[in-house]
């Protein structure tokens, strides 16, 4: 009886060990990208980390950018571009390091610059909006980039103020590695923790669109002060493609953004008509908002061409 029990225990432990190894090696569970809270930025990816999720390589440098280590200023013969964005620019765990929009921009630029070195920085994090991006620029600067590109999506026009309380509470923003890959899998199905009572509620602006447009205006002003070229691009939600198109409140927000770009003389690329002209626009998306590798390639190509 004892022998049978021992065999069962060993078998169960062996199965758990195999499951743990499989989850780590095949899917990258147990080693998620870690976030850190920031009073001004809200949150950002913890610096200097590497992992692999679902086979996709994720590397974060010392400035919490998705990319390899870099110097504060580029070499004299290097063209540096800084791309600001949210999960669409960052790529998340579902996008390999070489298939993000900034990585594709760098690859395309190298081919077209005929030998000139090109760096494209990826300063982004999941669910960042213009206020987060502005706070990042204020804290870290523009790294002597000659061009700054802000890529937003329609939802970003309604972004809330930066909220550091999500770090370590929301499963999408872990602040530490789980003890086991199995634990992380179970945590994916557990409800997020409510914000601690000690955390003051984040005040929601009365005019969310105006609040975000002000942040875009300030990013442009900072770029102008450093003689950097500033460019703004917006990708649409999947449901905005075709008919009936954007909802009424989104159309109003879009008009306000276009008016800002005209008033401030900002180079603005609206990808809604570009996506609508694509023969198979559904292939540009992996879900309702995030782009597929083909979508990333189209955006990268347009940002390089203009």
Descriptions of predicted regions:
Residues 27-108, 112-113, 275-278:
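Membrane/wall-proximal cationic-aromatic binding patches
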Residues 5, 285-306:
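Histidine-centered active-site loop/cap adjacent to the catalytic His
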Residues 153-258, 263-266, 271-282:
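Serine-dependent acyl-ester chemistry module
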Residues 57, 81-82, 88-175:
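Conserved SGNH/GDSL esterase-like catalytic core that processes O-acyl groups on lipids
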Residues 7-22:
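Hydrophobic membrane-insertion alpha-helices, especially the h-region
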Residues 78-79, 116-118, 143-148, 224-231, ...:
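Loop/turn elements at helix/coil->beta-strand transitions in domains of secreted/extracellular proteins
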Residues 88-96, 122-123, 205-209, 244-247, ...:
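Second-shell loop/turn segments in exported
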């Amino acid at each position: 009886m004892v022998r049978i029990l021992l065999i069962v225990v060993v078998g169960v432990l062996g199965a758990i060990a195999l499951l743990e190894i499989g989850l780590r090696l095949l899917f990258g569970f147990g080693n998620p990208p870690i976030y850190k809270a920031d009073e001004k930025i809200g949150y950002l990816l913890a610096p200097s980390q590497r992992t692999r999720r679902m086979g996709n390589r994720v590397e974060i440098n010392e400035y919490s950018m998705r990319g390899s280590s870099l110097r504060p200023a580029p070499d004299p013969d290097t063209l540096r571009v800084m791309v600001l964005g949210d999960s669409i620019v960052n790529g998340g765990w579902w996008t390999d390091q070489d298939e993000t929009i900034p990585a594709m921009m760098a690859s395309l630029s190298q081919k077209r610059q005929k030998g000139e070195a090109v760096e494209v920085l990826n300063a982004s994090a999941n669910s960042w909006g213009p206020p987060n991006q502005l706070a990042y620029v204020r804290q870290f600067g523009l790294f002597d980039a000659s061009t700054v590109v802000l890529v937003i999506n329609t939802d970003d026009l309604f972004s809330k103020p930066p909220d550091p309380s999500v770090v370590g509470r929301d499963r999408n923003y872990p602040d530490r590695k789980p003890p086991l890959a199995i634990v992380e899998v179970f945590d994916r199905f557990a409800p997020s923790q409510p914000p601690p009572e000690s955390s003051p509620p984040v005040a929601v602006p009365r005019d969310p669109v105006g609040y975000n447009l002000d942040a875009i205006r300030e990013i442009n002003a900072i770029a102008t002060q450093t003689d950097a070229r500033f460019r703004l691009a917006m990708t649409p939600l999947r449901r905005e493609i075709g008919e009936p198109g954007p909802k009424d409140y989104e159309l109003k927000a879009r008009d306000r953004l276009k008016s800002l770009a005209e008033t401030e003389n900002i180079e603005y690329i609206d990808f809604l008509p570009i996506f609508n002209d694509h023969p198979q626009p559904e292939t540009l998306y992996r879900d309702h908002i995030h782009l597929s590798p083909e979508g990333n390639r189209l955006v990268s190509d347009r940002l390089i061409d203009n």
